[in-house]
């Protein structure tokens, strides 16, 4: 990341190759001592020939604190995740939602800080499958924003030193009764950097653990 010859497009491509390789080599999730297939939607292409699911884990969005700057008359992020990270040196977008090169949906902007943390995806998944104490996991029923249907989520959180990474899967079942798990659908994963998100996940984990 501190390479003086840093090239943004090359870095994005290399990050995408890591993403593809990991899900090519790791197709199962071990939940309650049973291995289940992982499914991932890579057909919904969004930008630069890469799927929306990839851009979601490598970008910032409204959930990261967008507000309207009344002086500059534009939307801005309240916190830059890379402010104390070397990725800030190489970022050409600077979280500027008005940059014409951005073609992501839903007020999202590519984030090389989150891209630089892509290796945590593999680390966290491997540790979860190994039942490592470095992993906290919990399940939570949520309502889909699009369909308004209830869904059950599995959230996996990896923390070590300055690393704080979360992965989310949706439970999929063999039939409508939802009595038997058939697979897990990968939803998203990202480095956590803001206190609000950290506290929300802390609360969810404590609430789940108290009922276990």
What are these regions, as identified by a protein language model?
Residues 1-212:
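Ribonuclease/tRNase effector modules and their secretory precursors
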């Amino acid at each position: 990341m501190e390479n003086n010859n840093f090239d943004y497009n090359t870095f994005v491509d290399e990050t995408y190759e890591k993403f593809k390789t990991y899900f090519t080599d790791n197709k199962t999730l071990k939940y309650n001592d049973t291995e289940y297939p992982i499914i991932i939607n890579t057909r919904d292409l969004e930008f630069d020939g890469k799927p929306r699911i990839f851009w979601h884990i490598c970008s910032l969005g409204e959930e990261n604190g967008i507000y309207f700057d009344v002086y500059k008359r534009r939307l801005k992020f309240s916190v830059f995740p890379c402010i104390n990270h070397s990725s800030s040196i190489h970022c050409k977008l600077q979280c500027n939602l008005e940059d014409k090169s951005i073609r992501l949906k839903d007020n999202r902007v590519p984030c090389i800080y989150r891209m630089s943390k892509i290796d945590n995806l593999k680390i966290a998944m491997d540790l979860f499958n190994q039942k490592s104490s470095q992993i906290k996991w919990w399940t939570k029923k949520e309502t889909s924003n699009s369909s308004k249907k209830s869904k059950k989520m599995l959230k996996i959180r990896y923390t070590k030193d300055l690393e704080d990474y979360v992965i989310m899967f949706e439970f999929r079942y063999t039939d409508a009764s939802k009595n038997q798990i058939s697979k897990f659908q990968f939803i998203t994963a990202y480095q956590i950097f803001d206190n609000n998100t950290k506290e929300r996940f802390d609360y969810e984990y404590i609430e789940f653990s108290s009922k276990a």
